[in-house]
Amino acid sequence: RFDGKAFLEIEPIKNLSIKTSFAYQYNQWNSIGAEPAYIPQDSYGNPVGGSGKNYLTDAYYSETQWINENIITYHFDVNGHAFNFLLGQSNQYNNFRSTTATGEDLPSDNITVLNGALSTSAKGDAAEAALRSFFGRVNYNYKDRYLAEFNLRRDESSRIPKKNRTGYFPSVSVGWNIAQEAFMEKYSFISQLKLRGSWGELGNQEIGYYPFAQYIGLGNNYVWGDNKVSGVAISSLANPDIKWETTATTDIGIDAAFLNNKITLTADYFYKKTSDILLQLPIPGIVGISTEPYVNAASVKNEGWEFALGY
């Protein structure tokens, strides 16, 4: 296993910062498993089943992940108005590869190499994914009294078909720190009083490596003349029209504290809706394929109130 990170940050002019970072992670493991020969017997010592064969399994797995981020920030104040700007770009990549080999009927249970097996078989798998993002943020603060923030992300994922690969996800939040207003000075028992609201969208790309692709299965042999011929066949249907799953969240809340923060109160109303959820919907058996294609076919809503009172 290797896990490392490096970064470089410079400030070419006052209040302007430029930072680049790179993180890399590599994981690898190997395992060998053995199953000794065993023939179950009844109470009279007669064999009652079992192959009488021993088995050996040799497995290998490796995974690589890396991320590169490049971020520029700038901030300045003018007569109590504070502005913060952020502009960034990131690249992410990950892949994995696995191989499993199995041997059976070895001359001894003590042999742990596949060359000693009478017959062997192997299977493997590999996949990769990449995500490229651009993002920006503007933050405004006036004397900790009026607060506002706007964010925008542009994500491009290899897990989504090319025609819908790019998604835009904005968010905005505002706050009013009422306790900082001059007219609140006569209410000395109120230590804190803040109203806030936010709305934003996020995209979900954790939907498998190739949910839009058509899969081909091996082992579909057929007869041509007097000969058995190896063949392939479609094992799952493709849907090149799938798109990002998107979650939109709205939150409106109030934070309050009384008697020098001895009593605290937080209240929130939230509304969350996830749209275009990917599902595998049933298809008619006459199609002849058992694995259904992914479809953006569902949505889920959550709505409610949250209260917290502390002393």
Task: Kindly label every feature range from the protein language model.
Residues 35, 40-41:
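N-terminal, polar/charged subdomain of small-to-medium soluble alpha/beta proteins
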Residues 1-35, 46-311:
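Extracellular/periplasmic, surface-exposed regions of secreted and cell-surface proteins
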